[in-house]
């Protein structure tokens, strides 16, 4: 499954990053963190800074709303910032794919012992979707399919994030006419289904 961030055409691409930062801030708030979005400190900009309300652990989050593969140096830079700022953890949250080198670093890092591995966490599409499901922010794509009552779904279901709402975009194949229609399913209002036919 894919996650797309959608903004008005008049807005800059930095707005996509803000949507992702805001989403991460909401998820961290649920997990008992006090959150500050986009702060500038000497020599760096931090997308999301969070401090846990109970154990006072600190977290730096780098949010990347990129469509192209994320280069490995983004991971190195985040890890350096975590060390320089004496943070307890760093999160890399990316809606796009990781480059080959970045995948290699992620794999190496996730094979470290628990104490080392806890310093850096990677959240790509599957893990972001898990966080959203577990926090109750979205319902599963399977639940959406049941509501839409169609037998012919295409595989490329997408979660579309906008500034205010989240939608599942579900391609439905029409075997009779050889067309694909898209149903957008609004997360906050389960009865509100919009259908757009594409010929």
Name each region found by the language model.
Residues 1-199:
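Mixed-charge (Asp/Glu-Lys/Arg
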């Amino acid at each position: 499954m894919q996650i797309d961030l959608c903004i008005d055409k008049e807005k800059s691409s930095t707005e996509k990053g803000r949507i992702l930062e805001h989403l991460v801030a909401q998820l961290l708030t649920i997990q008992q963190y006090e959150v500050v979005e986009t702060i500038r400190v000497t020599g760096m900009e931090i997308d999301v800074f969070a401090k846990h309300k109970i154990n006072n652990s600190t977290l730096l989050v780098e949010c990347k709303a990129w469509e192209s593969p994320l280069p490995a140096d983004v991971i190195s830079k985040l890890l350096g910032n975590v060390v320089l700022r004496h943070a307890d953890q760093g999160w890399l949250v990316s809606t796009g794919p990781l480059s080959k080198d970045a995948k290699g670093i992620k794999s190496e890092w996730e094979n470290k012992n628990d104490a080392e591995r806890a310093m850096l966490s990677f959240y790509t599409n599957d893990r972001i979707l898990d966080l959203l499901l577990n926090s109750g922010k979205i319902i599963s794509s399977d639940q959406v399919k049941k509501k839409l009552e169609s037998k012919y779904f295409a595989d490329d279901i997408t979660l579309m994030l906008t500034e205010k709402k989240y939608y599942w975009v579900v391609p439905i194949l029409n075997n009779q006419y050889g067309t694909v229609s898209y149903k957008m399913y609004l997360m906050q209002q389960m009865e509100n289904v919009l259908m757009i036919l594409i010929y």
